C-alpha cells in the first residue's frame, strides 16, 4: 500500500477548503500584528496631543489618523487588539476550565454529578449574560479582566454540553469496555479514548465561543460600561461613536478589526467542523452496517423509494471492492490456509461451460433472465467493476439462491435487477429481461411501476425497514391502495388477512402497533406480508433471515416456502448461509469477487461442488461438522503418531 | 475434576429502568476449569451476554457470588478489577467498534501492557510477539484499524486479550460478524491458542454449530435461565430439553437431503408442542 492511498488527515481536509484557509490567514495576521504592537505601532497609544485631534488617515506619523484626543489610531488598534484578544481568550480559558472537566465527569460517570451539573448549566444559561455583567461592573468596578472572567463562567455551559453529549456517545463503545477490562485507570481511559473523540467538538466550540466573547466584550465597552483607561477595540468604538459626526472614519477601524476577527473565527470553526465531520461520517458508515431501507422500498410498492437509504446498505456490500483503503491486506487471511491462495485466480464465469445455462441467449420462458450483467461504480480511470459478466435465469415457482461472502457482489446483482443501485453505480453492460422487457434501458420511473406487482423485495434488517413514525397497518395498506387501487376498508381487510397468513396471532393488534412495539421476527413477517401483498411475479429477498434468531429463522423460511408455492413466485434469495440454501433453494449460483463461479441445481451443487471456491465455502460450514471432543481426539492422535 | 478457575453460584442480574425492574438472569450456576471451553448458547434476550459482562465486572450482579481462583470477586473494587485484568480478558463481537479507530494497532495492543507498568521497549517487543501469535504481519503495528478486514480486526482483538497472558478469556460472539471462511479460521486460531497457552474460554454464541466446534461443555440459556447443560456431544447432538431440541433442529443443515429430514422432525416438534399447549 503506497502512502498516497493513506486516508487524508483532518489538517489536509481543512487546508483544502479555501475559505477556511483565508479565515485562518486573516486571524493569524490580526493576532500577529497585535502581538508585535510595540514594533509595528511606532507611537504610544496613550500619547495625547490635542492639537493633532482628528487628523485624517495617511497624515505624517499617523497612518490611520488620530482620534478626538489626538492619539494615534494605528497604535491604539494594535495595542487594543492585545487587550481585546487577551480578554476574549481569558473568557474562553475560564469557560474551558469549568466546562470541559465538568462535561467529562458528568458524561463518563453520570449519576448525581450529572444531575447536579445539568441543573447548574441550565441555571447559568438561563441568566441574561449582559445583565449579570452590568451588575458585576456596578459592584466590582470597571475591569475588562473581571468582566471577562465572569463571562467565561457564563460561557462554560457551551463547552459542558458539547463535551457531555460526546462523552455519553462514546461511553458505551465496546473499545471503552475493552479498555476497562484491560485494567486501565479511569483517568487513562478518559485521556486516551474519550478525549480523542471530544477533541474535535471542543476545538470547534472554542472558535465560536471566542468570537462571542469578543463581541460581548466590545459591546459592553461600546455601551461605555467597560474600563476606558486602556485602549481596546470596544473603547475605540465608543470614542468613534461619540465623534461620529466629526470624523465618522474613526468608527471604521475598530469595527473592521472586530468584524474581521469574528468572521474569521466563524469561518475557521465551520471549516474545522467540515474537516472533522468528513472523517466522522466515513467511520460511522462502516460502523453502522446493513441498515435502513424504508418499508415503502421494502414492500416496493410505493412510488417514493428512499434510494438514499438503500445506498448505505449497498455501499457496504461494495465497500471492500470500491474502497482501496478498507480491504488492504487480505493476503494475511489467505496465508493461514494455503488452499485459499489459488482462489486468487478466479476463472472466467463458469456458466459458459458447467451449468445448464450454456445458452448466451436470454431464456424466454424465464420470469427473469440476466445476461452478461456488469455493474460499475464511478467513471473514468477510477471506475470499479463490482459485478462481472453475471448471467442467470429464474423461472416461475423457482427459488434461486445467490450465495457468497461479503463483497462478492450478490447484493449488487440484486439491486441492479431491482433498479435500485446506489448513486454512482450503474449497469455498464449486459441485459436484464423481466417477462421479456429489457430493464437496463428503462428509466427509474418506469422500473418503479414494476415494483410491488412485478418485482418485490424483502430486506435484511426488518426493524430498520419499518418507518418508526407510522403504524404497521398504514405501512401495509397504503401500498395496496396505490398499487391495487383498493379503498381504505378493502386494503385494511386484505392487510389483516395477510398478517394472519404470515402467522401473526393477533392481526388486529399488530395492525394498530408502531414498529417499536413488535419483535424483530414479527417485523420480518410484516415485511414479507408487504412484499407479497401485490402478488409479485418475482421476489428478491436479501438475507431475509440473517438478523433473526435461529428458531425464528426456521419459521420465516417455512413461511417463505409456503407463500412461494402458493403464489408460484420466482424468488431470488441472497444469502451467505448454505443451510438456508439447502432448505429452500431449487438452484444455486455461487458468487465470488463479482462473478458467478458456479451455478447448478441444489442437489448436484452440494453433492458435487466443482469450483474450488464452492468447495472451500462448503468445507467452512460448521453445521454437522466435528465437535470439540472430536477435534481434540484427532489432535491427540496426530501428536501420538 | 480439575481445579476450578471460575465458579458462578446462583448469579442473578436485574436491570432497573424508569422504576420497572427487569430480571435478566436468574439462578445461574456453573463453573469453568483451567484450560477448558464452556460454551454459552442462547437466542437474543437469553442473557448470555449479561453473564459474560457480569463476570468481567461491566455489569454488577444483583444476587449470587462469583469466585475466581478461590477468591470472591462478586463486588470487586475497581482496584481489584485492575489486578484481575491480568487473569481475565475479553474478545467482543463487533470487530468494528471494539477497536478505537484513532489508535494504531501498536497503541491498542500496548495499552494493557503499559497499564500494568511494562516499559515501552518491552511492550513493543511483546506487541511483535502478539502479532505473530495471531498471524498478522509485523508491519501491521503502525496501521489503523480501518485498514484491516473484519477477520483481521478480530485477530487484533484476540491479540489484545492475550497481551497479559490471562487464564480466562470471555469471548462474546467473537465470530458472528465474520464471513464463513474467516469464521472457521478465527475459531481454529482460538483452539490453537488454547492448546498452546492453556487458557480457559467462556465462549458466548447464538450459533450451536460454533459452540459445538470450540466447547468442551455447553450451557443452554433461555430467557435468563439455564435450561440444559452438559458435555458437548450430548447437548449438541442428543439434547434432552425441548428448547435445546428446537434450537438444534432450527439450524438448517448444508445438505438438501439431511435438511429435508431435519425439517420434518422440526415440524413434528412444532405440532407436538402446539398440541401440548
Predicted feature residues:
Chain B
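Conserved NTP-handling cores and scaffolds of large molecular machines
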Residues: 251-255
Amino acid at each position: 500500500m503506497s502512502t498516497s492511498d493513506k486516508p487524508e488527515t483532518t489538517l489536509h481536509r481543512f487546508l483544502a477548503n479555501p475559505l477556511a484557509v483565508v479565515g485562518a490567514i486573516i486571524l493569524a495576521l490580526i493576532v500577529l500584528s497585535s502581538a508585535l504592537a510595540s514594533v509595528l505601532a511606532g507611537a504610544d497609544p496613550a500619547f495625547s496631543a490635542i492639537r493633532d485631534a482628528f487628523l485624517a488617515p495617511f497624515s505624517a506619523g499617523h497612518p490611520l489618523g488620530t482620534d478626538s484626543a489626538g492619539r494615534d489610531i494605528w497604535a491604539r488598534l494594535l495595542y487594543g487588539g492585545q487587550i481585546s484578544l487577551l480578554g476574549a481568550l481569558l473568557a474562553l480559558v475560564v469557560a474551558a476550565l469549568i466546562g470541559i472537566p465538568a462535561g467529562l465527569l458528568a458524561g463518563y460517570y453520570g449519576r448525581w454529578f450529572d444531575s447536579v451539573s445539568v441543573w447548574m448549566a441550565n441555571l447559568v444559561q438561563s441568566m441574561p449574560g449582559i445583565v449579570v455583567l452590568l451588575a458585576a461592573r456596578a459592584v466590582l468596578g470597571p475591569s475588562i479582566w473581571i468582566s471577562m472572567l465572569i463571562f467565561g463562567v457564563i460561557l462554560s455551559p457551551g463547552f459542558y454540553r458539547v463535551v457531555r453529549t460526546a462523552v455519553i456517545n462514546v461511553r458505551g463503545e465496546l473499545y471503552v469496555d475493552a479498555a476497562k477490562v484491560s485494567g486501565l485507570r479511569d483517568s487513562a481511559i478518559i485521556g486516551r479514548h474519550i478525549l480523542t473523540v471530544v477533541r474535535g467538538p471542543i476545538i470547534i466550540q472554542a472558535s465560536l465561543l471566542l468570537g462571542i466573547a469578543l463581541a460581548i466584550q466590545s459591546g459592553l465597552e461600546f455601551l461605555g460600561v467597560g474600563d476606558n483607561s486602556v485602549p481596546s477595540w470596544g473603547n475605540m468604538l465608543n470614542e468613534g461613536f461619540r465623534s461620529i459626526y466629526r470624523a465618522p472614519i474613526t468608527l471604521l477601524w475598530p469595527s473592521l478589526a472586530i468584524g474581521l476577527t469574528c468572521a474569521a473565527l466563524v469561518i475557521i470553526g465551520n471549516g474545522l467542523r467540515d474537516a472533522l465531520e468528513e472523517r466522522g461520517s466515513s467511520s460511522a458508515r462502516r460502523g453502522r452496517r446493513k441498515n435502513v431501507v424504508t418499508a415503502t422500498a421494502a414492500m416496493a410498492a410505493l412510488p417514493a423509494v428512499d434510494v438514499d437509504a438503500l445506498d448505505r446498505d449497498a455501499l457496504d456490500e461494495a465497500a471492500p471492492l470500491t474502497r482501496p483503503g478498507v480491504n488492504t491486506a487480505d493476503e494475511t487471511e489467505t496465508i493461514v490456509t494455503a488452499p485459499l491462495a489459488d482462489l486468487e485466480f478466479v476463472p472466467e464465469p463458469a456458466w459458459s461451460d458447467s451449468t445448464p445455462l450454456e445458452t448466451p441467449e436470454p431464456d424466454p420462458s424465464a420470469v427473469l433472465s440476466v445476461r452478461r450483467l456488469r455493474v460499475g461504480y464511478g467513471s473514468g480511470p477510477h471506475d470499479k467493476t463490482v459485478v462481472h459478466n453475471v448471467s442467470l435465469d429464474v423461472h416461475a415457482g423457482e427459488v434461486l439462491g445467490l450465495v457468497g461472502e461479503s463483497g462478492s457482489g450478490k447484493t449488487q446483482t440484486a439491486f441492479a435487477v431491482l433498479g435500485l443501485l446506489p448513486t454512482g453505480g450503474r449497469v455498464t453492460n449486459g441485459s436484464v429481461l423481466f417477462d421479456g422487457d429489457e430493464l437496463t434501458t428503462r428509466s427509474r420511473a418506469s422500473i418503479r411501476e414494476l415494483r410491488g406487482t412485478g418485482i418485490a423485495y424483502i430486506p435484511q434488517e426488518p426493524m430498520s425497514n419499518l418507518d418508526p413514525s407510522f403504524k404497521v397497518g398504514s405501512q401495509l395498506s397504503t401500498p395496496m391502495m396505490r398499487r391495487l387501487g383498493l379503498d381504505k376498508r378493502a386494503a385494511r381487510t386484505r392487510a389483516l388477512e395477510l398478517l394472519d397468513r404470515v402467522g401473526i396471532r393477533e392481526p388486529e393488534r399488530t395492525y394498530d402497533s408502531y414498529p417499536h412495539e413488535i419483535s424483530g421476527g414479527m417485523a420480518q413477517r410484516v415485511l414479507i406480508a408487504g412484499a407479497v401483498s401485490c402478488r409479485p411475479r418475482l421476489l428478491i429477498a436479501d438475507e431475509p433471515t440473517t438478523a433473526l434468531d435461529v428458531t425464528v429463522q426456521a419459521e420465516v423460511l417455512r413461511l417463505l416456502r409456503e407463500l412461494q408455492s402458493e403464489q408460484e413466485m420466482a424468488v431470488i434469495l441472497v444469502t451467505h448461509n448454505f443451510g438456508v440454501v439447502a432448505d429452500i433453494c431449487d438452484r444455486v449460483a455461487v458468487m465470488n469477487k463479482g462473478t458467478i463461479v458456479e451455478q447448478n441445481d441444489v442437489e448436484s451443487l452440494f453433492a458435487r461442488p466443482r469450483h474450488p471456491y464452492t468447495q472451500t465455502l462448503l468445507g467452512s460450514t460448521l453445521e454437522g461438522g466435528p465437535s470439540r471432543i472430536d477435534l481434540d481426539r484427532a489432535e491427540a492422535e496426530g501428536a501420538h503418531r | 475434576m480439575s481445579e476450578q478457575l471460575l465458579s458462578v453460584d446462583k448469579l442473578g442480574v436485574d436491570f432497573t429502568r424508569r422504576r420497572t425492574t427487569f430480571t435478566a438472569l436468574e439462578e445461574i450456576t456453573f463453573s469453568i476449569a483451567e484450560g477448558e471451553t464452556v460454551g454459552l448458547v442462547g437466542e437474543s434476550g437469553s442473557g448470555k451476554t449479561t453473564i459474560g459482562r457480569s463476570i468481567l465486572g461491566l455489569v454488577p450482579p444483583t444476587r449470587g457470588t462469583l469466585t475466581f481462583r478461590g477468591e470472591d470477586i462478586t463486588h470487586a473494587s475497581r482496584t481489584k478489577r485492575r489486578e484481575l485484568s491480568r487473569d481475565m480478558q475479553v474478545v467482543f463481537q463487533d470487530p468494528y467498534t471494539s477497536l478505537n479507530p484513532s489508535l494504531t494497532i501498536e497503541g491498542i495492543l500496548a495499552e494493557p501492557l503499559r497499564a500494568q507498568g511494562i516499559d515501552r521497549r518491552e511492550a513493543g517487543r511483546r506487541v511483535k510477539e502478539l502479532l505473530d501469535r495471531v498471524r498478522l504481519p509485523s508491519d501491521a503495528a503502525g496501521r489503523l484499524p480501518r485498514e484491516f478486514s473484519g477477520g483481521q480486526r478480530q485477530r487484533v482483538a484476540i491479540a489484545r486479550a492475550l497481551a497479559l497472558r490471562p487464564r480466562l478469556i470471555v469471548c462474546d460472539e467473537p465470530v458472528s460478524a465474520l464471513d464463513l471462511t474467516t469464521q472457521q479460521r478465527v475459531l481454529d486460531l482460538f483452539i490453537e491458542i488454547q492448546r498452546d497457552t492453556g487458557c480457559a474460554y467462556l465462549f458466548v454464541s447464538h450459533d450451536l454449530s460454533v459452540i459445538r466446534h470450540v466447547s468442551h461443555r455447553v450451557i443452554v440459556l433461555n430467557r435468563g435461565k439455564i435450561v440444559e447443560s452438559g458435555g458437548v456431544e450430548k447437548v449438541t447432538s442428543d439434547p434432552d430439553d425441548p428448547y435445546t431440541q428446537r434450537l438444534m433442529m432450527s439450524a438448517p443443515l448444508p445438505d438438501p437431503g439431511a435438511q429435508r429430514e431435519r425439517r420434518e422432525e422440526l415440524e413434528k416438534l412444532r405440532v407436538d408442542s402446539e398440541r401440548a399447549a
